[in-house]
Curated annotation (Swiss-Prot):
Stated name of the protein: Uncharacterized methyltransferase BALH_3960
Entry keyword set: Methyltransferase, S-adenosyl-L-methionine, Transferase
Functional summary from the UniProt entry: Could be a S-adenosyl-L-methionine-dependent methyltransferase.
EC numbers for this chain: 2.1.1.-
Family to which this protein belongs: Belongs to the methyltransferase superfamily. YrrT family.
GO BP terms in the entry: methylation
Tree of life domain: Bacteria
Organism per entry: Bacillus thuringiensis (strain Al Hakam)
Annotated residues for binding of S-adenosyl-L-methionine: G53, E74, D97
MF-aspect GO terms: S-adenosylmethionine-dependent methyltransferase activity
Enzyme class label: transferase
Length: 212
């Protein structure tokens, strides 16, 4: 993942929270049960947490309230600025992304929501391999993102978006790197993790991977 998405993130920063509240009809189903999704990620995390894609700080805030020690990584300057307004003054957010980041001294859980699809499948594998080296046995990766059970599920979702006139959503699904569960299962298992997938809305699944 390079910097190709940073412009998009900067543009989206000031409207992101309205998206997650379901104000955009095309993305309403993508963000259905948003608060529950964040809570699920928090509940599956423990200890020192490395968060990729802090965004406007919604997950970060819940992690901090739950007593986690959080190290936040976010590539977008605009997102970092908005998040800092919402989070405790002493909390710092470091510039970086899934593949290029400052490594904290201690990591128990790596988390992210609505962001891992910015990496190609090859980049996802590189990232998970890197995280495997950083986590001790029992350490966890907890990612919530749009993924699909198989190719047929993906094809049907794209076609349904087009039929409903949701052309922005359809384009998004076809241009970013929304992967399939078998691909992610192979990536995690090949890098020493046991992984489970839990569906929380039509689009979003929570991937909980534990280092073996």
């Amino acid at each position: 993942m390079g910097t190709e998405f940073n412009g998009l993130f900067d543009e989206w920063a000031h409207t992101y929270d309205s998206f997650v509240q379901g104000e955009d009809i095309q993305y309403k189903e993508v963000f259905a049960h948003y608060e529950d999704i964040l809570e699920d990620v928090v509940n599956k995390s423990f200890g020192h947490v490395l968060e990729f894609g802090v965004g406007t700080g919604n997950l970060t805030n819940k992690l901090l309230l739950a007593g986690r020690t959080v190290y936040g990584i976010e590539p977008s300057r605009e997102m970092r600025m908005i998040a800092k307004e919402k989070l405790p003054k002493e909390f710092s957010i470091t510039e970086g992304d899934f593949l290029s980041f400052e490594v904290p001294n201690s990591i128990d859980t790596i988390v992210s929501t609505y962001a891992f699809h910015h990496l190609t499948d090859d980049e996802k594998n590189v990232a998970i391999a890197k995280y495997s080296q950083l986590l001790n046995k029992g350490g966890k990766i907890v990612f919530a993102d749009t993924i699909f059970a198989d190719q047929d599920a993906y094809d049907k979702t794209v076609e349904a978006a087009k039929q409903r006139g949701f052309h922005q959503l359809a384009n998004d699904l076809q241009t970013e790197y929304y992967t399939r569960i078998p691909v992610m299962q192979t990536i995690f298992e090949n890098n020493g993790f046991h992984v489970t997938f839990t569906r929380l809305n039509h689009f979003v699944w929570v991937m909980e991977a534990t280092k073996q």
